[in-house]
């Protein structure tokens, strides 16, 4: 891959990597025709050669692989809740870019094949702003992976040395950020077929020396797994909006501003087999509540069955073992 933090990152140029991926995928499928393979996209949306890298890669292996593997971790500075909860817009921009790129390659090859996407790493987090170094460009020599720090402490996987596993910013805020991303995946289910939540256990539970307990994300993801089935239905929302100014977390993670971000985020799934229309709604406004009116005139004969709500008076609250029911 192309990340300068990766050992051997420039051993293969994008064409060389694409050729290797093509030949490897062919051999694997000759051994087992049921195997599906994925080829890696660029390591970050902030790389100066994104998305040119994956364009060159796909030109070599489009016919033999099944997925373009993507990954991204959205970051927002402490206290900027709207930037954290608006992170799904950058994911959708990422998805639209890669899907369009895949379709361009298909058109150039006159191929009927439609490449699918897989998110093999994703997440959202609060990160303190780091010192910026103007003029050095992306991935400059101030980055930690170019330096040796003899005083850097190693992570000890020892119960008596266990680090704090609580989420920065609180369980509820972490859950809302992740669910907003997952709803974006649901809206793009025609192309995004796999999404691996990298910090799975870390996101779904918290722990201390003596206890492990379910965090807010556990309940939200459980409901998505149960109810986000069938056919993804596009939603149209009329609500108040806000603007997100651009910001830089560090020399690498720099986000353009976004205008007219809807305060209400939504996705829907029609479970035809069980005769259910399931609607998922999230409020990005930490200062106001909203009344929701749903127009489902296309589903005559359906009736309201039930709703689940996750709510807290304090978005920054962090749970402990005593909170789990």
How would you name each of these model-derived features?
Residues 42-69, 122-138, 204:
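Substrate-binding cleft/loops of secretory-pathway carbohydrate-active enzymes
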Residues 25-48, 95, 99-123, 194-198:
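Aromatic-lined carbohydrate-recognition surfaces of secreted/lumenal glycan-active proteins
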Residues 259-301, 307-310:
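Carbohydrate-binding surface patches
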Residues 119-264:
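Aromatic/acidic polysaccharide-binding cleft in carbohydrate-active enzymes
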Residues 1-35, 41-43, 47-55, 76-91, ...:
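Active-site cleft segment of glycoside hydrolase catalytic domains centered on the general acid/base Glu
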Residues 24-27, 31, 56, 60, ...:
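Generic, well-ordered alpha-helical scaffold segments in large soluble proteins
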Residues 2-6, 44-49, 74-80, 123-129, ...:
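Flexible loop/turn segments at secondary-structure boundaries
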Residues 317-323:
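Conserved small/polar residues in nucleotide/adenosyl-binding loops
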